[in-house]
Regions:
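A conserved ligand/cofactor-binding region detector
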Residues: 1-136
């Protein structure tokens, strides 16, 4: 994962705790949707840590900012994309398998936001991905 070392045991513990505190259930009692939410919250925690570091770096540098306005954004599903961007997809897949969970079944629980209906939405998403990849 970016900046934050991936700890498989910590990840598994966090997923179990999220199921427990969000739904008052054990992992074995949780539905696939609840497990998806618990995994998403765990990934969100890592993203937030990295986001805060980025924000502090931007405040120090005072860089130029680009704004892109679009009524459509076809970003697709976020969980798998975020795991890939964090460089942790394989490790998370392995951790989930150790918990008896299939990452593909978990990813299938996420609805596609479909914020648009065509080329402009896909173009907006490509612009965002490209700028992020180029560290803008």
């Amino acid at each position: 994962m970016i900046d934050k070392q991936f700890e498989k045991e910590e990840f598994k513990k966090s997923v179990k705790e999220n199921v427990k505190f969000l739904y008052r259930k054990t992992l074995e009692e949780a539905t696939q949707e609840q497990i998806f939410q618990a995994v998403s919250y765990t990934v969100k925690d890592v993203i937030i840590d990295n986001w805060l570091k980025s924000q502090k770096a931007y405040e120090k540098q005072d860089p130029k900012i680009v704004y892109y306005m679009s009524m459509e954004f076809l970003m697709g599903r976020a969980l798998g994309n975020n795991l890939i961007n964090l460089g942790a997809y394989g490790e998370v897949k392995e951790a989930l398998e150790e918990l008896g969970l299939d990452i593909n079944c978990i990813e299938d629980q996420e609805p596609d936001p479909a914020l648009g209906n065509g080329g402009l939405g896909r173009l907006a998403a490509c612009f965002l991905d490209s700028l992020a990849t180029l560290n803008y």
